[in-house]
Amino acid sequence: MEKKKVTLTESIIILIVLLAILGISVIKFGLSPEVPVLFTVLLLTFWARLRGFSWQDIQNGIKEGIGVAIIPIFIFMLIGALIGVWIKAGIIPSIMVLGFNMISGSFFVPSVFIVCSIVGVAIGSGFTTISTVGIALFGIGSSMGANPALVAGAIISGAVFGDKMSPLSDSTNLSSAVAESELFSHIKNMMWSTIPSFGVSLILFWILGNSGHMDPTKIERTSQVLQNNFTISWWALLPIVLMLICAWRKIPAIPTLFMNIAITVVMIFIQSPHESAQSLNNLIMNGFVAKTSDASVNALLTRGGISSMMATVALIISTLSLGGMLMKFNIVQSAMEPLVKHLNKPGRLITVTIISGICINLFVGEQYLSVILPGRAFKPAFDKIGLSPLALSRVLEDGGSVINYLIPWGVAGSFAASALGVPVLQFLPFVFFSLLSPVFSIFSGVTGIGLKWAKKNK
């Protein structure tokens, strides 16, 4: 069959069918997303061949899709290694014990949200926040008997806030660059949607965090088990300080993680001078295996290792293969282009831009593309009606990068689920910050409150 340009109707049908397959498989039947995503890749490949696309076209689409994830995949592998050595060296157990002594049960969940927000702004990486301080706070919550999904929601909400508002964040810099807005003006302008989202999220975490029962006996028992089996000290916080220094010095993620793993390995050898190279290799590859007298502590701290990230890596490769093919065959672009012609009102334009970012997260699963594609598609429309580039860059964050954590087959969502051990569909209702950000952004667009216009229109 001769290859022809994909029509709008055809694009919409394909996107609806693919989303239906993924949604029914993951949500209705509770399947792990890896196989349904691979099945959609197979279906799209079959359609592409029927439409006249060559195997080379298909392979190029897959390669282009996966290409954007090579660095994140490498970072995920390093984070897996970091989690294992951090537990072995007593870093995560030390944070847990210190947390037991410093955070009251009644204000625990809001405290998790606030701490992860602060760390996220300082580090500029939601992934690193979740996989380090986030895991320690999750452990504290488990020991307190808090709802795991609620605690995970607070951790992710704080990490997303920090990632969104940090000048060190990749996604923040990307949104600013795509919209051609000045970085710090962009961060300042985001407060119109970010502050209300943060405030409402904090209230909801406080209300829901007080609804559970905290068991002080279990907390004391867990603290004692940790102190009996790990080296608990303030020195264990040294790798965290190193991470903050690297963020302040704007050192990229990969060398930061390498340095952190190296200094943690040195700490392990100081604590256990006779540690063999074989056991260290096994720790980095397969993670830490806790063997304490408490089964709940063992379940909580048996994690990490490069191998623990392989399921996430497989999902990312499959999802981005699908996304790359959708882009290569112009399916996503052809579905977006007609929308631009009819958007001459700020409220309508902002709403459609946010919905487009959400849809790209659903179909492509990659947060950077959920910023880049709507940014390129709708920038002329923002310019045409006189909106400032700051309006566009804020919308790209609110509908793009913050949403990826809510997608079971998304890069960020699958990573958070793997790191915390809570499925996306369980923590999704509690990631209030990500859920509220697009709502307040649309409200701003419809009402005009906090909406930034180009200077020539003012």
Question: Model-predicted segments: where are they?
Answer:
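Short helical (or helix-break) motifs at transmembrane helix termini and adjacent helical loops
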Residues: 127, 159-174, 372-381
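Hydrophobic transmembrane alpha-helices of multi-pass small-molecule transporters
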Residues: 1-72, 194-196, 200, 209-315, ...
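Short juxtamembrane and helix-loop transition motifs at transmembrane-helix boundaries
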Residues: 1-4, 87-97, 114-118, 213-227, ...
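Alpha-helical transmembrane segments of multipass membrane proteins
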Residues: 19-24, 45-46, 114-118, 139-140, ...
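Transmembrane-helix bundle segments that line or gate the permeation/cavity pathway
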Residues: 154-155, 160-163, 167-168, 198-214, ...
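C-terminal transmembrane helix pair
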Residues: 6, 12, 178-194, 198, ...
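Central hydrophobic cores of alpha-helical transmembrane segments
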Residues: 132-138, 155, 256-266
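Membrane-embedded alpha-helical segments and adjacent helix-loop junctions characteristic
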Residues: 52-142, 293-379
